């Protein structure tokens, strides 16, 4: 493969820490594959953001690369121990049942505190993880009591979660990942180098795991595509532990042509970006609106419900539309919506997810809890 003048120095680098700031469509993952192929004797870990990325990466990287999510690494050490009490996510009803309380406002704060703690790099669960009073410098005596009660309950739940014998409180995936991070795993016994893609959106837990490694490190990301800051994700490209790294840039995009690149550069200039994105892909047009008779069009939404509402609107306007659902229609939780509709109408026999019936007395209670949370 013919590498560009931007990719070649990255692929040939011998630096212990490599940092690549890359624009959209500039071949971030392709460059990492090239780096791996250029270093066939290195035992490389490609740390994937999620399982779908892991699956796709396994078909791209050479045999000296192990493609894993952080959860996969943690599962081999801790997750497997909790197989008998594992769950995808903790829910309000799990917390309420475990604490034997119907104070849903308090339960919501306890759950949020636990999720914040599990997503953080912190060793101890404490006030910084309690969302309600996070920005308050001073609290009233009543607020102090509520804070103490919430933190005490969150610690009780955490202790029960990590207790292998306590099957009354389940262990979520983020829980055993937290245990793995707290153990400060040393990956140098298995790997010589770690590759991190999407470095602009690293979970603090994963960032902490990477931070403690003493092996070669290459991080690639686009600082203009931070999507998960609302979940606490951090930009590893600007982290203290990457200070002194050999820096590179990827600015040539094959995803679109010069027209889109021109508009993107105008927008990015307002963020202070001085490097220019180059559009070397297919010729593209940027218009204020789409022609009414356009046979195909794509709609992008920030939320799943936005996609579903748009699809419903299209059905109203056209009785026989043809849709392509990115990721497959099953990934949009339509079955859950159908269950909720049946539940709201008292048609319990039509609800397929029986856990919904066990967790909530009726639809009124479901709405009450949903509004609080």
Outline where the language-model segments fall:
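Non-catalytic, well-ordered alpha-helical scaffold segments
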Residues: 68-71, 75, 104, 108-112, ...
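P-loop NTPase Walker
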Residues: 1-83, 265
């Amino acid at each position: 493969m013919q590498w560009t003048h931007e990719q070649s120095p990255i692929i040939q680098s011998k630096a212990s820490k490599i940092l690549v700031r890359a624009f959209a469509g500039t071949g971030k993952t392709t460059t990492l594959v090239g780096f791996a192929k250029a270093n066939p004797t290195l035992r490389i870990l490609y740390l994937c953001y999620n399982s779908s990325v892991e699956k796709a990466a396994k078909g791209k990287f050479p045999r000296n690369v192990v493609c894993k999510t952080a959860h996969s690494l943690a599962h081999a050490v801790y997750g497997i121990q909790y197989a008998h009490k594992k769950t995808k996510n903790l829910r309000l009803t799990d917390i309420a049942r475990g604490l034997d309380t119907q104070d849903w406002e308090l339960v919501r704060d306890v759950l949020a505190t636990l999720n914040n703690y599990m997503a953080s790099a912190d060793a101890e669960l404490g006030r910084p993880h309690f969302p309600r009073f996070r920005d308050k410098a001073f609290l009233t005596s009543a607020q102090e009591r509520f804070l103490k009660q919430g933190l005490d309950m969150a610690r009780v739940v955490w202790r029960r979660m990590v207790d292998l014998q306590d099957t009354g409180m389940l262990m979520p995936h983020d829980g055993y990942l937290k245990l793995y991070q707290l153990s400060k795993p040393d990956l140098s016994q298995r790997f010589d180098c770690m590759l991190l893609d999407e470095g602009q959106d690293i979970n603090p837990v994963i960032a902490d795991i990477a931070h403690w490694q003493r092996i070669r490190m290459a991080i690639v990301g686009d600082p203009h595509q931070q999507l998960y800051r609302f979940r606490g994700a951090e930009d590893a490209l600007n982290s203290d532990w990457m200070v002194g790294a050999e820096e590179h840039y990827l600015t040539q995009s094959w995803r679109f042509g010069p027209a889109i690149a021109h508009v993107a550069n105008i927008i990015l200039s307002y963020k202070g970006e001085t490097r220019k994105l180059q559009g070397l892909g297919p010729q593209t047009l940027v218009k204020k609106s789409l022609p009414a008779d356009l046979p195909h069009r794509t709609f992008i939404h920030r939320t799943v419900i936005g996609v579903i509402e748009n699809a419903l609107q299209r059905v109203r306007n056209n009785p026989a539309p043809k849709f392509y659902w990115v990721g497959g229609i099953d990934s949009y939780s339509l079955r859950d919506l159908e269950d909720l509709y049946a539940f709201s109408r008292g048609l319990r026999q039509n609800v397929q997810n029986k856990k919904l019936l066990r967790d909530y007395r009726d639809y009124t209670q479901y709405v009450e809890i949903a509004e609080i949370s």
